[in-house]
A protein has these predicted regions:
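Long, contiguous hydrophobic alpha-helical segments, chiefly transmembrane helices and signal peptides
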Residues: 67-70, 74, 94-95, 148-151, ...
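Beta-strand-rich recognition/accessory modules
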Residues: 537-569
Length: 569
């Protein structure tokens, strides 16, 4: 049993430990109790496919029993029209598409192993596909991930059931989604209306959802339909996304419009990127490398049979949400069906090699910096600013949302500016509120009217220049609160100077008072701050993207502050 099969086995075994089995009301048996969310998640039927994979692999009946258990429990959220509620108290039904995908992949690969229950699974699956055919069209009020997912689902339905109507809608949805590609080759539309444009001209881009859900589904559709032109377009999406895969296998979603679900390895409720990349390995060898590195990161974030929501969750004492495990178990099973295996020596990815470069992404108002061993993002992304107060407050304002060292790993990774559950049933809460703090680099001022920060100014202006081996990015803005109100007389300038092995940050703040500080949370122990300012430190953690950090809080003097980040082990 190779290491990846063992990983899937550990996930399946972990899920079985949390499966409800012996309630007197047998209709409630079969779901997984979530140790993080203290409830059951309505999409637990997504575990059927990986459980059937493990049954086929081991012939251990416990996996098939678990698969039938989640299938039976789904009746608790299954409507008479065969659409599915997201949860027992959440009326969203778009997730019907993920149930259909899981059942179709089970039927295509393991119908015989379902035994005398195959017909029941097939009947429910076909009824779901009929609902999706009629309802989950381009007119459905949803983000593009659902349209993309249904393109893949309908292609699978055509492959299994053979009905041309499924092929036709899959093709239509695929064509529609492939119109939502930015000038830099990224899929957009991860907000509704899908073609929305911000004041700055940005579109709705979320790397986590793109790489783990939308683009894999589009690839399924293109390959099943056998459309070489569309396959080539999806391949370009896969290639463009690799500019956001960090050398350790993580996905950089530090700026994403849905980064409230960023887990460093991906996103909280999607299936994963490995199968899509591995499926295309013969067309581009770096795709296999991407798949392997991401699975290796998932393995490092797995403890006691569950996938944790970030690299430091387990160490900090946070519980694992089972949603991560049953979704990514489906994705890993998909990759294993294709034959994926670990390799000791993989190839290279775009961000592996040290270089000196700067690239601007206007669709996300973000500069990507490569400076020697350092990778950084400086962002002024303003998409979704009206929903910041609802818990979607990704970094903006000229924030350095990511700093990664090719030698030492992640150094800075922006969280939400204020953690609020935008999707209460898909996000967990911490029991350690005192130390749960933003991981975002920022100027911050507090007064009687609240907290104002540079990381929330969606109107900040960025400029950048490269002079031989030195890159400088400057941001100018005004401290802003969560509701979008600007603090009078609180204009700021942030200047980032990147050299091959260090970063210097100079900050200026008009009318800086005693309540104004620069906060720099550093992840790991490789980076060292040198400053003349008073520097107060404490240990913090944030659920997004799941890191422990040392928070440095530095005081302004005469409205100015400067510090240098250098590296040592």
């Amino acid at each position: 049993m190779n290491r990846y099969v063992s990983l899937l086995k550990s996930w399946c075994d972990g899920l079985i430990e949390y499966q409800i089995k012996e309630l007197a009301d047998s209709t409630l048996n079969g779901a997984f109790v979530c140790p993080a969310c203290k409830n059951t998640h309505g999409r637990c039927d997504n575990a059927m496919f990986p459980m059937m994979y493990m049954f086929n692999e081991t012939q251990d009946e416990k996996y098939r029993t678990c698969a039938f258990g989640v299938f039976d429990w789904q009746k608790n959220v299954l409507l008479r029209d065969y659409s599915v509620y997201n949860d027992g108290n959440n009326e969203w039904r778009g997730i019907t598409v993920f149930s259909a995908i899981g059942y179709l992949k089970t039927l295509i690969n393991f119908k015989e192993q379902l035994g005398n229950r195959a017909a029941e699974v097939e009947k429910r699956c076909k009824s779901m596909c009929e609902w999706l055919l009629k309802n989950l069209t381009v007119n459905f009020v949803c983000n593009i991930n659902y349209i993309a997912a249904n393109s893949g689902a309908m292609a699978l339905a055509w492959q299994y059931f053979g009905n041309e109507k499924y092929r036709k809608i899959s093709e239509d949805l695929l064509n529609y989604c492939l119109e939502f590609i930015t000038e830099n080759g990224l899929l957009f539309g991860e907000m509704f209306p899908r073609n929305s444009v911000s004041r700055r001209g940005c579109t709705a881009v979320d790397i986590g959802y793109n790489v783990e859900e939308s683009v894999p589904a589009l690839l399924d559709a293109a390959l099943i339909l056998g459309d070489e032109e569309k396959i080539a377009k999806v391949q370009k999406l896969l290639t463009a996304q690799l500019d956001f895969m960090l050398p350790d296998g993580a996905w950089d979603n530090s700026f994403g419009c849905r980064n409230y679900k960023w887990t460093y390895w991906g996103s909280r409720t999607s299936d994963g990127a490995a199968a899509a990349y591995y499926r295309m390995k013969d067309r581009d060898p770096q795709f296999e490398t991407a798949a392997l590195r991401n699975i290796d990161l998932l393995e490092r974030c797995t403890h006691d049979g569950l996938l944790y929501g970030g690299p430091d969750y387990y160490k900090w004492g946070e519980r694992a949400c089972v949603h991560h495990t049953f979704c990514h178990a489906l994705g890993l099973a998909d990759a294993l069906v294709l034959g994926i295996k670990p390799k000791d020596n993989g190839g290279e990815l775009p961000l592996d090699k040290p270089c000196c470069s700067i690239k601007y992404y206007p669709e996300i108002a973000t500069y990507r910096i490569n400076s020697g061993d350092l990778i950084a993002d400086i962002t002024a992304y303003d998409f979704g600013e009206n929903s910041f107060v609802a818990g979607r407050g990704h970094a903006t304002g000229g924030t350095m949302s990511l700093l990664f060292s090719r030698k030492y790993g992640v150094v800075a990774a922006a969280s939400l500016s204020f953690y609020r559950t935008a999707e209460p049933l898909n996000q967990q809460l911490t029991l350690n509120l005192e130390q749960h703090a933003p991981l975002t680099f920022r100027i911050e001022c507090s007064d009687e009217s609240g907290i104002y920060t540079s990381a929330l100014d969606t109107t900040a202006e960025l400029t950048a220049r490269k002079n031989e081996s030195v890159i400088t990015v400057t941001a100018q803005g005004t401290l802003t609160n969560l509701e979008g109100r600007k603090k009078t007389g609180a204009e700021y300038i942030l200047k980032y100077t990147f050299e091959s092995d260090c970063v210097t940050i100079d900050a200026e703040l008009a009318s800086a008072d005693k309540g104004c500080v620069f906060i720099a949370p550093l992840i790991g122990d490789a980076a060292k701050i040198t400053t003349a300012s008073r520097d107060k430190t404490r240990e913090i953690f944030n659920l997004v993207p799941g890191f422990i950090a040392t928070e440095h809080s530095m005081c302004f003097e005469n409205g100015k502050l400067s510090f240098k980040l250098s590296f040592q082990k």
